[in-house]
């Protein structure tokens, strides 16, 4: 969120200093699956998701880099009647938010997506959704922001933040910086910054368990997921042939060192669910697993908008593992809000003041 916000602010003529505690893109983004989806999303996020989807196809031109955005569609398989009911209710509700899902019967799945979900009783398909490369997007935004005049400091650990007569002062291991405005895009650590200004946000830190196979013949075009009340599996095949997968098991806990670690004992259970989506993966070799820290706000909605206590402070954090698709829209919306004082995309559901009521 930080690099996208920095980029869109520079496009509006704002001088930006971006302070990164680690390396660009090494936080929740790099742990992301890379899913560009609106299907199954919390409905209050849909206007923001629609805004973001309209930007993804323009990023290669704007950022000067192919971030591997591909609108391959998002297929969500259904294996039981609970999943079918979930899909039907969401499909009905989502119509008012600008999303229309195709409903597929088993014969449609076999014809359009052979080899996927042979035991599925139905599926939904969102043709405009897809995926992008989470390892490329943050560096691409950061590079474009720098070319637009932004100053970027990596491995800059913040020790103090204070409100001054003219704005804010931030003391870091890379020096002390002053600015008129402060944007808190600190991800899972966003509540720590908000707390400095008297704003509490209930959040839990956890990490997804992700994995990737060896390169395989390219057979899986859409992103594939499941409609389920449980932690359903999901996967996609990248252009190099590797299949990236996740879900189906509980998120890993974050240790005292601030890192999320995978639990290798969960891999067997995870793969059992993955092969339900694509049985041909039963013989695939897993070459790597990973995780990363994500912040899950108590009500599973992000914090986004102006501070409720401090003039000139803005927040954009806590996207609960659903933020990758939203990133460009968040950056664009925050830049609009900061430079004009309002936003054409509704942000009220994400107001930090909801926790002080």
What are these language model-derived features?
Residues 215-312:
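Active-site lid/adjacent beta-loop-alpha segment flanking the redox-cofactor pocket in flavoenzymes
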Residues 67-78, 90, 101-106, 110-148, ...:
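Helix-loop-beta segment of a Rossmann-like dinucleotide-binding subdomain
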């Amino acid at each position: 969120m930080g690099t996208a916000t920095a980029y869109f602010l520079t496009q509006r003529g704002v001088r930006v200093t971006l302070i990164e505690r680690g390396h660009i893109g090494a936080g929740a983004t790099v742990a992301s699956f890379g899913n560009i989806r609106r299907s199954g999303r919390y409905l209050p996020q849909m206007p923001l998701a629609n805004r973001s989807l309209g930007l993804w196809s323009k990023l290669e031109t704007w950022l000067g880099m192919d971030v591997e955005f591909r609108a391959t569609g998002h297929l969500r398989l259904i294996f039981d009647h609970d999943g079918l009911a979930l899909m039907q209710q969401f499909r009905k509700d989502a119509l008012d938010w600008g999303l229309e899902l195709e409903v597929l019967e088993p014969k449609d799945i076999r014809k359009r997506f052979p080899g996927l979900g042979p035991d599925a009783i139905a599926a939904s398909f969102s043709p405009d959704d897809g995926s992008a490369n989470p390892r490329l997007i943050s560096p691409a935004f950061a590079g474009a922001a720098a070319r637009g005049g932004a100053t970027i400091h990596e491995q800059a650990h913040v020790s103090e933040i204070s409100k001054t007569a003219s704005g804010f002062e931030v003391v870091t291991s890379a020096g002390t910086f002053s600015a008129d405005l402060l944007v808190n895009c600190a991800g899972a650590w966003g509540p720590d910054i908000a707390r400095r200004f008297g704003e509490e946000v209930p959040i839990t830190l956890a990490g997804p368990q992700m994995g990737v196979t060896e390169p395989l013949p390219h057979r899986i075009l859409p992103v594939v997921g499941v409609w389920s009340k449980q932690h359903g599996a999901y996967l996609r095949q990248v252009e190099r042939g590797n299949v990236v997968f996740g879900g189906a098991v509980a998120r890993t806990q974050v240790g005292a060192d601030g890192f999320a670690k995978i639990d290798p004992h969960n891999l067997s259970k995870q793969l059992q669910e993955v092969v339900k989506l694509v049985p041909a993966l039963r013989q695939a070799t897993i070459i790597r697993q990973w995780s990363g820290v994500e912040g899950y706000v108590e009500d599973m909605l992000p914090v986004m908008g102006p501070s409720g206590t401090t003039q000139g402070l803005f927040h954009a954090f806590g996207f609960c593992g659903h933020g990758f698709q939203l990133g460009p829209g968040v950056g664009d919306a925050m830049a609009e809000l900061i430079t004009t004082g309002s936003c054409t995309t509704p942000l009220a559901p994400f107001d930090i003041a909801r926790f002080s009521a």
